[in-house]
Amino acid sequence: MNTHNDWKNLLSIFNEDLEKTGYSLFIVEPEEGFYDCEILKNGELVETYAENYYEDELSDLITDAAHHVLTYLAR
């Protein structure tokens, strides 16, 4: 299983769904082997959702972050 492609594909799917809201998720690797998930609105940082995750945790993290955004939008 290619973990890199799995989370990249999931990120792409969620960002397509979020596109109409102006929100998007962005994964950064500030330190080798550790990843952060940022939430952007119209390309501007809204919040750093999570920090210091391993690559094999990113699919769950992306799902949680997308749920976080959708819950916020549903208010």
List the predicted regions and their residue ranges.
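Acidic, low-complexity, intrinsically disordered interaction modules
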Residues: 19-64
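Negatively charged, low-complexity tracts enriched in Asp/Glu with abundant Ser/Thr
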Residues: 1-24, 56-63, 67, 74-75
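A general structural signal for short secondary-structure boundary/capping elements
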Residues: 43, 72-73
